[in-house]
Amino acid sequence: MKGILGLSLLPLLTAASPVFVDSIHNEAAPILSATNAKEVPDSYIVVFKKHVTSELASAHHSWVQDIHDSQSERTELKKRSLFGLGDEVYLGLKNTFDIAGSLIGYSGHFHEDVIEQVRRHPDVDYIERDSEVHTMEGATEKNAPWGLARISHRDSLTFGNFNKYLYASEGGEGVDAYTIDTGINVDHVDFEGRATWGKTIPTNDEDLDGNGHGTHCSGTMAGKKYGVAKKANLYAVKVLRSSGSGTMSDVVSGVEYAVQAHIKKAKDAKNGKVKGFKGSVANMSLGGGKSKTLEDAVNAGVEAGLHFAVAAGNDNADACNYSPAAAEKAITVGASTLADERAYFSNYGECTDIFAPGLNILSTWIGSNYATNIISGTSMASPHIAGLLAYFVSLQPSSDSAFAVEELTPAKLKKDIIAIATEGALTDIPSNTPNVSHAAVGIYKRNELTQKFSSLPGTVVVPRTTPTSLAAVATRSPLPRTASRTVLRVSFTRPKSCSPRSLVPSTARSRMPSSHRSELVLSRRRSEDLVFF
């Protein structure tokens, strides 16, 4: 099997082991290596088999640490490191992880003698050599922002609309958005106090974004001025250092943190401890070589209910050769340009689900609470889609609402976002790559919407006209603030006991273009309970 190293059987050190020698399998677990990434010397990720419980895992953790501590070679091990991340990576067991019970394991820095024993333990499924991951931004260039405008228009941008983003002002409300990256400048004014520091994974690192990459992605996802879902709550999960690099094992731990936080929030909402919670999304604009562990972690997170967007990568190569881009259940995002081309650096291939703006993207930055920067990469494309995930999740009734509908699962929303995206708009798309782009915010033809979403309770349907933007269709609040925009005529599926009534007072109608006044007929139960796609 490619990537598996054949190692000879070494003497077992069992003094500290809670298992007997004869309980060790003769067949060793494989050691996987990424062929396209820089490995972290003597650092490993160990994944348990499915039968392993938290109790068994805890006993194993103690066992492996005792074995490591008994090795006289650990002093020499510290001298051999080439990675330069500090002494914490030489202390044996580093991180443990349990992602919704679907992926349990640990990471650490071990001598090969220890790893040889670990791989023959009956509870171990596979071991992966830890490797470097990094951010995915490209060159910095000056240009006008355009990404938000592009995702809210079906057709190519023109001089009249290249800087106009049409959206629901409450998009993202009730949604937690996790930025698994270099951190977030949580005090930036564009976040309006909605950004919180979640967790710093790299040991002995500080709780701040010393790079800017994570802050930029967060601004695109949920900033007031630069963001798609302008009311989402942001959480910083720092897995990369200020250099923009880190380890695969730390990224896995970051995924675990986001998944656990989501599960807890959802449980609290179900028990009435939290009001108005709609769901959680995560963005990972980072990548490295092929990693089964990271892909398994992301897929487990999606299964646990966390909506995931990941960057396809900037290698102008097949995204299936990189992780987390190859994670099957996440939405993998390539980068497009203002001219509706595949960005020259963007990865492609069957693992790329959709393209979004990724060239010359203006967003929030570090250095001050007002700083901005323009950078490029699939790193910039992915948070556009993560923002859309938050946007659409927020437009569902919360689980504590009297009008709650069936849960919008990550699998369903991924399918729906791809289904309503623009097909065939981009050039320079390889034949094995889906030509799907932008996932425009609320741009639907009547037959698209009724065919794709008619089965969902409470779905908005469009009885006539093909709009060029979401405009007020996705606005769940009373419409005076949006009355000057183009508004669709829509209807809403509601209980028989609820009577529809107009959302728009006559004063709002009078401010609308005459060509649209006759089309403005919206039904509602309560504004916070309308469901839109």
Curated annotation (Swiss-Prot):
The active site is at D181 (charge relay system), H213 (charge relay system), S379 (charge relay system). It comes from the Eukaryota. It is an enzyme of class 3 (hydrolase). SUPFAM superfamilies: Protease propeptides/inhibitors, Subtilisin-like. InterPro entries: PCSK9_ProteinaseK-like, Peptidase_S8/S53_dom, Peptidase_S8/S53_dom_sf, Peptidase_S8_His-AS, Peptidase_S8_Ser-AS, Peptidase_S8_subtilisin-like, Peptidase_S8_subtilisin-rel, S8pro/Inhibitor_I9. One of its GO terms (molecular function) is serine-type endopeptidase activity. Disulfide bonds join C320-C351. This is Subtilisin-like serine protease pepC. Glycans are attached at N283, N435. Residues 145-450 form the Peptidase S8 domain. Residues 43-136 form the Inhibitor I9 domain. CDD domains: Peptidases_S8_PCSK9_ProteinaseK_like (cd04077). PROSITE patterns: SUBTILASE, SUBTILASE_HIS, SUBTILASE_SER. Residues 1-16 form the signal peptide. Keywords: Disulfide bond, Glycoprotein, Hydrolase, Protease, Serine protease, Signal, Zymogen. Residues 496-519 are annotated as: Disordered. Pfam families: Inhibitor_I9 (PF05922), Peptidase_S8 (PF00082). It comes from Aspergillus niger. GO terms for biological process: proteolysis.
